[in-house]
Amino acid sequence: MVAAVRVIGGETPLARYVLKVLRDRTTGFPEFRRYVRIAGSILAVYIAGELGWVEEEVETPLGAKAKELAPAGPVYLVGILGASLPMVEGFASMMPEARIALVAARRVEEPGRLKIEVYYSRLPRMFDGPAVVLDPMLATGKTVAEAVRLARDRGASKVVIGSIIASRQGVEYISSLYGDTPIYTLALDPELDENYFIVPGLGDAGDRALGVEP
């Protein structure tokens, strides 16, 4: 099964404008961080359709009744540290009730291959609802795949992936493992370079969003 990929940049000019700002090498980190946050909010609008909702009746200030929607239960945002921090914030601004979990991983490069080592996670013992894995750059897909595995192993009722830019290679890797996991991204770029950066991409999202180069 091939994962369903929805490229939001093809659906709204606002996403393309956000991408323009983020891709521009002259964008400074305060503005970059701000637009990563906006990208998270845009993703929330689209990913919301994947989550469970129930109809609830409320009374308006005029004493009239109206039926609208509310989350069917807890929703978890699983952020990949650290560039995802403003992205998670943007998503949570649209769904303030969302619970936030974190996963941190490092690359371990070996001759001929790349491995991912998770060195920190703050996850519920068991998920009692859907999980949205958020990572600005879905490059090789290995870190995101590990976060998906952790969420599924802990009982997430559904897992959805949100990114700002995804590579075709990363999407194919996710599909090979979790073909039933939908992927939402503002852009789908064609390739990775020798350092596993997405091309054309936007550079190192972590350095640019946090303003600190390790």
From Swiss-Prot:
Catalyzed chemical reaction(s): UMP + diphosphate = 5-phospho-alpha-D-ribose 1-diphosphate + uracil
Listed NCBIfam families: PRK00129.1 (NF001097), upp (TIGR01091)
Recorded metabolic or biological pathway in which this protein acts: Pyrimidine metabolism; UMP biosynthesis via salvage pathway; UMP from uracil: step 1/1
Reported cofactor(s): Mg(2+)
Residues binding 5-phospho-alpha-D-ribose 1-diphosphate: 107, 135-143, 204
Activity control note: Allosterically activated by GTP.
Taxonomic lineage of the native organism: Archaea, Thermoproteota, Thermoprotei, Desulfurococcales, Desulfurococcaceae
Annotated Gene3D superfamilies: 3.40.50.2020
Binding site for uracil: 198, 203-205
Family per similarity comment: Belongs to the UPRTase family.
Note accompanying the cofactor annotation: Binds 1 Mg(2+) ion per subunit. The magnesium is bound as Mg-PRPP.
Known role: Catalyzes the conversion of uracil and 5-phospho-alpha-D-ribose 1-diphosphate (PRPP) to UMP and diphosphate.
InterPro entries given in the database record: PRibTrfase_dom, PRTase-like, Upp_A, Ura_phspho_trans
EC numbers on record: 2.4.2.9
Protein name: Uracil phosphoribosyltransferase
GO terms of molecular function: GTP binding; magnesium ion binding; uracil phosphoribosyltransferase activity
Coiled coil location: none
SUPFAM superfamilies assigned: PRTase-like
Broadest EC class assigned to this enzyme: transferase
Annotated GO biological process: UMP salvage; uracil salvage
Keyword set, alphabetical order: Allosteric enzyme, Glycosyltransferase, GTP-binding, Magnesium, Nucleotide-binding, Transferase
